């Protein structure tokens, strides 16, 4: 599937936005409308190596568990997470958050999600509307991220090691 990219502009300094995003426990707050049942993979949820498992609430998704682990954390510019999802965790995923300074102290956040389906069946399932669905859900996540950082609104539950 072609990469899915969404972005938003947040009225906050880039360092503040980065500090929020580099804690994977915070990600459940702005993605819980389609990613649920979060569990951290280690106690330290900040920085390189931090990870989580979760279920993706997608229509017709029989194999809903996925995971993500931060593999690159370049303060305050970029965070890269890799993971797996789908049947037997055979679909590789790469998510990249890129933060750029904007006008008047704002921050432009761009999130790109790439998937690498392993089989013809996985590619077929993705071709049946997954790209549009992911774009809509991730665009909503960016709006929620902006509301949380700017106003403290639309907060979901923060995940813990034993689930949140």
Which residues fall in each region the model found?
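Short, surface-exposed coil-to-beta transition loops
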Residues: 3-5, 63-68, 90-95
């Amino acid at each position: 599937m072609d990469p899915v990219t969404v972005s938003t502009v947040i009225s906050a300094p880039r360092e503040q936005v980065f500090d929020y995003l580099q804690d994977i426990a915070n990600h459940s707050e702005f993605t819980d409308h389609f990613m649920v049942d979060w569990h951290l993979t280690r106690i330290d949820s900040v920085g390189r190596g931090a990870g989580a498992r979760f279920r993706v609430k997608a229509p017709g998704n029989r194999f809903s568990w996925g995971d993500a682990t931060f593999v690159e954390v370049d303060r305050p510019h970029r965070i890269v997470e890799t993971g797996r999802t789908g049947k037997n965790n055979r679909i590789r995923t790469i998510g990249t958050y890129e933060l750029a300074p904007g006008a008047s102290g704002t921050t432009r956040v761009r999130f790109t999600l790439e998937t690498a389906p392993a089989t013809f069946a996985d590619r077929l399932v993705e071709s049946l509307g997954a790209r549009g669905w992911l774009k809509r859900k991730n665009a909503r996540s960016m709006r929620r991220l902006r509301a949380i950082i700017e106003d403290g609104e639309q907060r979901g539950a923060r995940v813990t090691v034993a689930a949140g």
